[in-house]
Amino acid sequence: EFVWQHIVSKSWQLLTAPKESDAHAGLQLLKLYHKACVPDMHEFLLIRMGGKACGDWTCSLMDVHAGRLEAQLDEAKESFAHASHKGIHGTVAALAYLAEAADTVPLQRMHDLIQRVWTLVSPYLCAAAPENAEAEEEDQVHESPVSQRILSFSWRAMKEVAALHEVCALSHMTEDTVQEASDLFLTWLLSIRHRGAFSMVYPR
């Protein structure tokens, strides 16, 4: 119960925080219990997170966090303004960490999630960015608090999605997967007009 209350539950809560520092703290707690939690507690913790054990601890955690991201994306599709009060970047970062640690990665599911995030945020990141406005346009450029929040949500999500995409590509390197990964990175680099997000998706 101590592990759940002070480590796992806290990580679960922080991973959806809108602030990058809070989500990062949640990720560090995930790394702690992923590596240090004794096997006898795995099933108990997975049930508390709404998941179930599927034999492998890392894959079970991936399944739980992938399900959570799917639910977050469903919510954002219904009302992006409401969903942007939290964040998905922490959940995506958790998936990238777990994918890197896993023996096998559910590539199709990860690819679908990456595409869903891109579909969600691309209208905001591909629009003309205020920081790129010409001097004479500055008076016409105004961002409401809601649009600022959505933009922040979007570029943070895109940063972590790029990292997840890279991990997935490296986990199963074939000529086709490398080409697909390159094509998607190129699409992002050619489409994104928001300076912060553009710098984040450039592959390492």
Where are these regions (language model features)?
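Long alpha-helical scaffold regions
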Residues: 3, 22-25, 38
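Alpha-solenoid HEAT/Armadillo repeat architecture
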Residues: 16, 81, 100, 170, ...
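Extended HEAT/HEAT-like alpha-solenoid repeat tracts in very large eukaryotic scaffold/adaptor proteins
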Residues: 22-30, 79-98, 113, 138-169, ...
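Alpha-solenoid helical repeat scaffolds
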Residues: 35-40, 101, 171
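Short, flexible/disordered intra-domain loops and linkers
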Residues: 42-46
